[in-house]
Amino acid sequence: MTILASISSIGNVKSISKSNNFSSLSNSSLQSSNSIQCGGCGGGSPLIGTVGNLVGGVLVGTGIIVGTVVGTVNGVVGGLLSGPNCGCH
């Protein structure tokens, strides 16, 4: 009984580890797409986009959606501050 319980707990740890790796990979891909799509062309807007991506990188797991929203909002604000040709592309 003890051997079976320890084996099943090892299997649970492996599956949790795999799901964490997947969420961090998808977070990185969303984060990189935010930096490509949302950016400014002058002033402080690149800094604003960088702050949004840093927030997206800190929030892992459920923060994937939150980081995407923050990056998009910051890109739009940076575009409004910089001019009509800047923002999310």
UniProtKB/Swiss-Prot annotation:
Species in which this protein is naturally found: Dictyostelium discoideum
Family: Belongs to the hssA/B family.
Alphabetized Pfam families for the sequence: Coiled (PF05710)
Protein name: HssA/B-like protein 15
GO biological process terms held by the UniProt record: sorocarp development
